[in-house]
Amino acid sequence: MDGQILANSIVTLKGTDLRMVYALLLKTNIGHLLSSKTKDVISKLSKEESDNFTYHLEQEVNKLRNVEDQVLQVDLFLEITRLLKLRGTKYTLEQEIVDQSTFIVKDVYQLLLKQDKQFKSFAENEWNSTKLQQMIKFQMSKLFNELDNSFKDFTIDDQTKFASQVNEYIQGLPEEKQRKIKEKLGVDDLTDEMIRKAIATSGSSIVFAIIVEVSGFAFYTTATSLLASFAGLFGITLPFGVYTGLTSTIAVLANPLFLVPVLLGGGALLVNHQNKSLKKKLMPIIVMQITLPFMSQGADDVSFDLFIAEWNRRFDAYCKLQIELENEHAEGLKLQRNIRETKEKINYMNSAIHNEEQKIREEKKQIYYALKSSNLEDLGINGDFQKNRIEYQYINDRIQSLQQAKKVDAVNDSFFRRIGNKFSNLGTTFDIKSEEKKMNKYLYLMVEDVLKSTSSFKQIERERIQASKCNLRELRQSKNEKMTYKNSLESLLKQVNQNQSSIRQDIKAMEKQNYGLEHLSASSQQLLPTSEEG
């Protein structure tokens, strides 16, 4: 029952009522309260009337004028579930909203039991009322208790005016209910004077409780209107006369008994903790402010359609992001697999290129050693070969001359000459090695000349080298193509990774703005397994 009432109250809360509650819960923090109280104190010192906290709420309400009701309703509902740390669920059916609302009432009820020790004994005496009714009655009763002393300070004329408006409400009730109120108040007649005396002697809290018991919660609307009308006398200042629904809340927030525990709850510097403490402290008040309009006046046609449509819009957008992320992830895996396979092919080509290059080196060695052991003058390769052969033979002759000179010096047995010859032979040895390098160079040049020729000399080796070179060209071309392909894949993968990062940020933003989405699976549209919280 309580869950249904709260759910109905949320989807029927509209206009300024909705925006004031929204501003109070989502647009108010400990800084606003402290700043407002400070400004009020300064104003009092200068003997100026002000209510800066109410002004803050009014400003926030004005900012929300163009926001659709269902958007604010869903935001408000999700914020309550976030503060209570309820597990998120789908809200595609009315019953799902009602079930979650039932959990909200139960949790807020427990919060109020912890926050106010008086509530336990009050609830025990209200055993025939639901948890939701107990919370509302208790909070309104506390407010009226605060006003009892103020009422005694009214002039008789003001007391009579106040009682007259209360009596006007009673006179509008059926006669049977009027009779019950007379019995419970112990009066013979329901006149303005009798009501005034009853309030003056028993207190507004007792009188109002009797009226609510008989007539229902509709009287609270009249009571809050009365508070607005007599706000100046009660010490409550409202700069806007049209809206009166938050009168009780403003009075509670202005009470030091509410503010001081919040400030002390987390230490002077723990602002975030203070804000959470403030919002938790506000939860019973918020639930009361949400439900009072519906419980007092009811609604002819309660429809969840707009609320559900707004939730579905958000959930569909969330599912779309999740699906996009899954698709990007799958694309990323596909690209990684293609990159890995392409790298393997490139490695295979590098190995094949190395093998072909090794074959060419081996075949060139065969030609090299064949030239070294052949009579070069008998080989008619080509013109370049003949030029290089002449240089090669010239260097070879010079090496032989140097070696012969070393032998002549070696047979001289004079002591000093032998010492001189050792230095001379050392220089000759260096000269020989230098000439051998030159000769080797020309020998390799002749190998290249053979490869360029059409001679029958080492034709098989030459053909093998040509075949290997052809294979090399094909392999290198294929490798370049694979490298280009790999680079394009890596570029695509980089873009996919960036897309995934961007989508994850969008998902996180949606989860932050819409508590409970992180508990849902977009692909299966089922609840995800509960993870252990640290």
Identify what each model region corresponds to.
Residues 246, 356-482:
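Long, amphipathic, heptad-repeat alpha-helical coiled-coil stalk/linker regions
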Residues 183-211, 215, 234, 238-254:
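Membrane-penetrating hydrophobic segments
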Residues 171-175, 179-182, 199-223, 275, ...:
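Solvent-exposed flexible segments
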Residues 223-314, 437-445, 461:
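Membrane-engaging insertion elements
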Residues 317-353, 381-392, 427-433:
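Short, charge/polar-rich alpha-helical segments
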Residues 1-205, 355, 360-362, 392, ...:
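Terminal export/targeting leaders at protein ends
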Residues 307, 318-319, 326, 476, ...:
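Extended, compositionally biased accessory segments flanking or bridging domains
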